[in-house]
Amino acid sequence: MPASTIATDVRGAIKTALAGVSANIYDSVPEAPIVPAIIVIPDSPYMELEVLGKSTTRVKLNYTITACVAYFSNAAALDNLEQLIISILGALNASKYELSVVERPSVTEVGTTTLLVSDIRLSVRYEQTA
């Protein structure tokens, strides 16, 4: 059995859990996201050590799930963002993921595109296997 990795067992699992949401899903920061988009990025602190030993390493990993929609009309963009956030929250299994807060929306520029974005804080426990 191959060793577990955070890329596969955590970010990949989050991406899979979000597969039913109508958005492009990125498990790393894209150069130019296609909206609507969900981007999974490490938060700070990224890793909180829980068990560190010769045979077991267990950490709490903290992520930001960034929901992004096009910003053409303020009212429509906010409605689209709220719908995307509710879809994301519904797709993530609360027993596996710890969801804490959804940050207020903000406008951001990515390249030449203006986006309305909001961050969702998520934590998950990960144990390294051999």
What do these predicted regions represent?
Residues 38:
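Helicase-core coupling region on the C-terminal RecA-like lobe
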